[in-house]
Regions:
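Residue(s) in the substrate-gating loop at a strand-loop-helix junction
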Residues: 141
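Active-site helix of classical SDR
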Residues: 121, 157, 165
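Substrate-binding pocket helix/loop in short-chain dehydrogenase/reductase
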Residues: 96-98, 102-110, 192, 203
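Short C-terminal tail/terminal secondary-structure segment
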Residues: 92-95, 146, 206, 223, ...
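The beta1-alpha1 cofactor-binding region of Rossmann-like NAD(H)/NADP(H)-dependent oxidoreductases
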Residues: 38-39, 59-70, 103, 216-217
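A conserved structural motif in NAD(P)-dependent oxidoreductases
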Residues: 207-218, 229
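Alpha-helical segment proximal to the catalytic Tyr-Lys
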Residues: 126, 170-174, 231
């Protein structure tokens, strides 16, 4: 599905990002894994290479526009082009009522989850324009569609990612670049796995499928949207949510 494509993943050291990188490689892409967690990112790249794929790891601070430019330049230097990018890196931030958030707790989440995606998208677009286009998938959230108490910076950032995605699609569709967003619900990541059993059971009950999702289930959707099989699909938000938003 992605044979001979070059794909870049941010936040690829673990969880959903790692699953996306692995599925990209399984489908034939050469993968650039990026993260600020060097051991985890290198482990993801090693997993892909040991399985017969081709991957490299590059460190990335998503809040640095210069670092994004360095990573994309190195990707093009090593592989000749950039066909696919998945902007996945993000944090949940602190859980507080909106009135209790500080400028610092707000800015940290917005800088990583929204501005970091903008820095990535901007740099990725400019690389893709040189080779005739590509596909960008931004990882949003179910909270890019609805609210949730005590996490307003995250909700605001993810709504922003959905809006940014639509604008990129409108601006660059005629130039061969597609851009979509994927909104996971609660997924079996390290954060969720470490929650008490009663909390995880409650989270499971909020989904129509009555379970928490697997990272690979999100990754399969991302890989399909990244591929030429989704050639007429752009500017859209896709929930990988087990029916959470059907409530």
């Amino acid at each position: 599905m992605l044979k001979n494509k070059v794909a870049l993943v941010t936040g690829g050291a673990e969880g959903i990002g790692r699953a996306i990188a692995v599925v990209y490689a399984r489908e034939g892409a050469r993968v650039v894994v990026t993260d600020c967690n060097d051991p985890g990112g290198m482990e993801t790249a090693a997993m892909i290479n040991q399985a017969g794929g081709q991957a490299i790891y590059l460190p990335l601070d998503v809040t640095s526009p210069e670092n994004h430019e360095q990573v994309v330049a190195e990707t093009c230097k090593q592989f000749g082009r950039l066909d696919i990018a998945c902007n996945n890196a993000g944090i949940s931030g602190e859980f507080r009522l909106t009135g209790d958030h500080t400028p610092e707790t707000w800015k940290q989440v917005i800088d990583i989850n929204l501005t970091g995606v903008f820095y990535g998208v901007r740099t990725q677009i400019n690389a893709m324009l040189k080779t005739g286009g590509g596909s960008i998938v931004n990882i949003a959230s179910i909270l890019g569609q609805v609210g949730l108490e005590e996490i307003s910076p995250y909700v605001a950032a993810k709504h922003g990612v959905v809006g940014l995605t639509k604008n990129v699609a409108l601006e660059y569709g005629t130039k061969g670049i597609r851009c979509n967003s994927v909104g996971p619900a609660f997924i079996k990541t390290k954060l969720v796995n470490n929650l008490p059993d009663d909390v995880r059971n409650h989270l499971s009950s909020m989904h129509a499928l009555k379970r928490i999702g697997e990272p690979e289930e999100v990754a399969e959707m991302v890989a399909w949207l990244s591929s030429d099989k989704a050639s007429f699909i752009t500017g859209n938000y896709y929930a990988a949510d087990g029916g959470y938003l059907a409530r």
